[in-house]
From Swiss-Prot:
Xref: HAMAP family: Ribosomal_uL6_B (MF_01365_B)
Subunit structure, interactors included: Part of the 50S ribosomal subunit.
Function: This protein binds to the 23S rRNA, and is important in its secondary structure. It is located near the subunit interface in the base of the L7/L12 stalk, and near the tRNA binding site of the peptidyltransferase center.
Database matches in Pfam families: Ribosomal_L6
Keywords: Ribonucleoprotein, Ribosomal protein, RNA-binding, rRNA-binding
Family from the record: Belongs to the universal ribosomal protein uL6 family.
Protein name (Swiss-Prot/TrEMBL): Large ribosomal subunit protein uL6
Molecular functions (GO terms): rRNA binding; structural constituent of ribosome
């Protein structure tokens, strides 16, 4: 039995929730997010709160209810406050710039790397070696950050590459003679 699923998701003022079967739509000041919930989960909307429980006949009902609760809680936080992810570029000549919805990266290749951002994600560069991603969809922000990091992962000897701001890169010792 999931302890996570037992806690209701409180819906703050200014957030609108539409429940249509297993499709839930949450709208707030930062946009609108829609998600289809697993058939094993029963959702009830009452008193500015969403409650979750398993449907009869499903073995993994409580597990799916806990997952659904966590996803919908992230959606509510996303449309009210939003999510941010910070990336750092470490290395000589590594630079980033944002033009519209395209992130331009100079990562030591013979060509610049242009990454187009999906709808709902915005990026800004406070400095040439920092990228800040903002948006309402937690999963999409993480995916875009992982895609940008994948162009040049931090290497284990000098730590050069694209890394998350809170990431600790373990470096190896150089070869001894």
């Amino acid at each position: 039995m999931s302890r996570v699923a037992k806690a209701p998701v409180v819906i703050p003022a200014g957030v609108e929730v539409k429940l249509n079967g297993q499709v839930i739509s949450i709208k707030g000041k930062n946009g609108e997010l829609t998600r289809t919930i697993n058939d094993a989960v029963e959702i009830k909307h009452a008193d500015n709160a969403l409650t979750f429980g398993p449907r009869d006949g499903f073995v993994d009902g409580w597990a799916q209810a806990g997952t659904a609760r966590a996803l919908l809680n992230s959606m509510v936080i996303g449309v009210t406050e939003g999510f941010t992810k910070k990336l750092q570029l470490v290395g000589v000549g590594y630079r980033a710039a944002v033009k519209g919805n395209v992130v331009n990266l100079a990562l030591g290749f013979s060509h610049p790397v242009d990454h187009e951002l999906p709808a709902g994600i915005t990026a800004e560069c406070p400095s040439q070696t920092e990228i800040v991603l903002k948006g309402a969809d937690k999963q999409l922000i993480g995916q875009v950050a992982a895609d940008l990091r994948a162009y040049r992962r931090p290497e284990p000897y000098k730590g050069k590459g694209v890394r998350y701001a809170d990431e600790v890169v373990r470096t190896k010792e150089a070869k001894k003679k």
